[in-house]
Amino acid sequence: WAQSLKPIPIYGTTHADHTTAAIPCAPPMSDDKIAGNYEYETGFQIMDHLKACGLSYTEVEMILVGNHAPFTWGKDAAKAVYNSAVVEEIAKMALLTQQLNPQVQPMKDALIKKHFDRKHGVDSYYGQ
């Protein structure tokens, strides 16, 4: 997905269990950022794109950077590693979904909200 410069749409409940948004894909870095302090600028590329999408790093703990790879984080190293596995699995499922049904539409907002809130909402009750 990062190499295609596309965000990962929400097609299924596994994705919605982790976030209510498509996994964003920040644009490729400009030449001046690549030539500068590359790692530092990558962080700004991520934060700037989340802001442009109206998202917070607390809402979405994963992002793609165009022509690069996924970046993940969490409350600790274990959560960041877990999120890395999640984004890889979500990416595979989304690709297979599009191959099986090129006209597929993202999930309904009501189902996205239900799956996210039951695990992360104020009255959460479900966790695997």
Regions found by a protein language model. Name each.
Residues 1-128:
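Glycine-rich flexible loops
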